[in-house]
UniProtKB/Swiss-Prot annotation:
It comes from the Bacteria. GO terms for biological process: translation. This is Large ribosomal subunit protein uL23. Disulfide bonds: none annotated. Keywords: Ribonucleoprotein, Ribosomal protein, RNA-binding, rRNA-binding.
Length: 109
């Protein structure tokens, strides 16, 4: 896999209560990934970038919500979420903390 593709597969960690519980209990990390990425690419990207052994990868395509402003209808984009189970107990707490800090600095909630 090329270096460009490797970096474009993983987008961001998905921070939620369910993701945090999965990380603590079943050693699973939840990531936002490219919509066209497959399980093999996701596993290879995580293994190479973070130097961990990947046990399994499960993916879900989250459908975008329909939104309305006045009489105008719009739709948010679909996105893909990957549940990556790691072989050993190694969770990226620093990555999730840095991501949250970056979002707060940029004004996101």
């Amino acid at each position: 896999m090329s270096q460009e593709r490797l970096l474009s597969v993983l987008r961001a960690p998905h921070i939620s209560e369910k993701a945090t519980n999965n990380a603590e209990k079943s050693n699973t990390v939840v990531l936002k990934v490219a919509l066209d990425a497959n399980k093999a690419e996701i596993a290879a990207a995580v293994a190479q970038l973070f130097e961990v052994k990947v046990d399994s990868v499960r993916t879900v395509v989250v459908k975008g919500k329909t939104k309305r402003r006045g009489n105008k209808m719009g739709r948010r984009s679909d996105w893909k979420k990957a549940y990556v189970t790691l072989a050993k107990a190694k969770i990226w707490t620093s990555w999730t903390v840095q991501s949250n800090r970056r979002k707060l600095e940029n004004g996101y909630r």
